Amino acid sequence: MARRNSPEAIAARHAFRASYWNWRSFRAKQLPSLTLTSDPSLNRSIQSVTLEDGSDKFVHRNQLSVDAGLEIQQNIALTGGRVLLKTGLERLDMFTDNISSYKSTPVVVGYEQDLFGFNDLKWERRIEPIKYEEAKKTYIETLELVAAYTTNRFFNLATAQTSLEIANYNFAYADTLYRYAQGRYNIGTITENEMLQLELNKLTEQTNRLNAQIEVDDYIQSLRSYLGISENITLVVIPDDSIPHFTVDVNEAMQLAFQNNPDISAFERRRLQSESNVAEAKANRGFKAALYAQFGLTQSNEKLKESYRDPMDQQLVTLGIRIPILDWGVGKGRVKVAKSNRDKVYTELEQERMDFELNVAKIVKQFNIQAGKVAIAYKTDQTAQRRNDV
């Protein structure tokens, strides 16, 4: 019930759901995308045009342009580029001259690439799977922690119920002694001061009983709320007296911890993110260039069918460059900062990994002695019972 209804479990489900859709979005970026584009426009205006003799003249334009195109794009993670394949058709209607014409682009192949730039797709392919694996392990860990929290609330209530039983017994015992004291006082065998002391003991035990009952009610409310039980019911927990006899091997526990604990995935993610920041700082510091190349076929005609006959080839190549000449050390400083942060992360991860191993060993050691501690407590309880009977 707690794994389904507790606040921690509900929050963990929402967090994992968000991580899942982030993972789906990352996977979708690796797949081809298909896009339909269309930009119809109506132009009724007076515009200036340049004639063959170089003079300008205002002419009235009354035209409608309607186009549609299909485009497939695919990201290339290895290079960080993008390849595209598209086709389209455009119709132009000149209402003034009552002329219609078509322009077709049966096929166009293009490629876009940042040269010497930061390849975020490559780093995402390394980091995102680890982030998703970390999210899955975190969700499982949270559910296990919910079980542990529920167990703690269970035994808190069990302890409070035992304390209430002891408080009831102590009150009954103190009340009995006080009644006997009243009888003895009436016959003059004890002093008034002795009787008043026993009455004070009774009142103290009565207060202890009230406090124990309040504590039980509080723990019932805490457990009921954590389990998602809205009904106002009384819970009575019955702990099991049997103790499983087994020990945990330190090496096996260490191996399972490295396999299943989300902290290990977080260590690797943080390391890769620090290296990614260094690579990005280096790429943004120096020479940058962007290449775009497009090759395809195109044709135009006043008839739709004829616009697809004997298409002509078309090419478009653009190259943009950016060369920092003087930045007063800004780029170099950013690289130094990124490297310093990376080295800091390395140091932190080394220490946290060592602490992780020591913590696992400590928890295993503490767990393995629990059975012995419970056995000693049980023996102590039996001895106290025998002493009380005597």
Where do the language-model regions lie?
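Amphipathic alpha-helical coiled-coil segments
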Residues: 11-26, 142, 146-168, 178, ...
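Generic alpha-helical secondary structure signal
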Residues: 106, 176, 248-252, 316, ...
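Periplasmic alpha-helical coiled-coil/stalk elements that build and connect Gram-negative outer-membrane
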Residues: 126-256, 366, 370
